[in-house]
Amino acid sequence: MNKRLFPALVAFVIAIIIGTFFFSKEGGEANKNAQILLEQLNKERQKSQSLAENGSYTSKDEVALYIYKFNKLPKNFITKKEALELGWDAKSGNLWQVSGGKSIGGDRFSNREKRLPEADGRKWFECDVNYNGGRRGAERILYSNDGLIYYTPDHYEHFYLLYEKRMQ
């Protein structure tokens, strides 16, 4: 989706929601749902506008939105190979000491157990989220080369879809 079309699309969706909110014959529940959806859209729009392409991000929501918006990881991510070349030892949890505060991300995820959707030509990648130094935690984002973005809070036990298609 063109970057200029996105604000117009958001405005259109908001207008429809507001129209539903004001002109709903059902009242009560429909109005509450419209209000909640409108608030969520406004929050997402504000988050999207506040992300800088040259920024560093570590939280699940920011990293997922960054991948969705820019089709790449933030600058504060390095692959395992790059980390090893800097002297990283996973057992000692010294990543921040050798990398200047970077997080692990960008390596291929094999999806051997086929727990994520498969498609011809689809490749999966992973990155750590909510990393605060020391040993790596269990939280990861898995993202595909065709725009799927998933979150796992428990090292690949459960997966939650965050985004389905990239912004263009």
Predicted segments, located by residue:
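N-terminal low-complexity, Pro/Thr/Ser-rich intrinsically disordered segments
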Residues: 30-72
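Hydrophobic membrane-insertion alpha-helices, especially the h-region
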Residues: 9-21
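Sec-dependent signal peptide cleavage junction
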Residues: 19-34
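Second-shell loop/turn segments in exported
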Residues: 64-73, 138, 146-149
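Functional cores of ribonucleases/endoribonucleases
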Residues: 84-168
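A charge-rich, low-complexity, intrinsically flexible signal that marks solvent-exposed coils, linkers
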Residues: 79-82
